[in-house]
Amino acid sequence: MARKETLQLPEVNFSEEGPIRHLHLGSEWIQGSMLVDAPTVLVHEYIQRMMAWLLFVDPATVAKRQALQLGLGAGSLTKFCHKELRMKTTAIELNPMVLHACRGWFKLPADNARMQVILGDAAQEIRKPQWLGVVDALQVDLYDEEAAAPVLDTADFYADCRATLTEEGCMTVNLFGRVSSYQKSLDKMAAAFGMDALWAF
């Protein structure tokens, strides 16, 4: 019987900086952080900016909406959408060790009626029929251990992202990296959404 090739995933570790705990993927790059005494606070400015979609919706409707995070990180967005906004929330994460770390060290709740984590490839998962046209807030933060560029950054991927959204749905993407090209990423998003639909925060 043929053996399936095993995907090599980076080890997960963390560090402490005063009241803040950081998640790392086998490198110095911070993949997410948590204020230990206030685990749902959004510590980093870029994470706060990924909540910019709230500017475009009626606050009274937020709890009735659905959020989907591609990339769990330290679970900041997942915890915030679930606990603070009371939204139905799902995260898709490739690395089971990241999920284990989030549950053990970053106070991510167990799966429940309003929150779940799916272990899998985000690019494949979002193409499943269950995600078509149902997501109100899609939050994309997909980096490897080197944090050099988004690991999923193609026009086809962004077209699949758009297909998950409701009519009022919004996608926020963390664009950061030592070798990533901001404009090239924007052009790929524009191919799916149209340049007029893109905003920088």
Locations of the language-model features?
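The AdoMet/dcAdoMet-binding core of the Class I SAM-like
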Residues: E5, A38-E167, S180
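A short, flexible beta-alpha/helix-coil linker loop
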Residues: E28-G32, Y143-E146, M171
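Glycine-centered flexibility motif
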Residues: G32, G120-A122, G194
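Short acidic, glycine/proline-rich loop/turn micro-motifs
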Residues: S33-D37
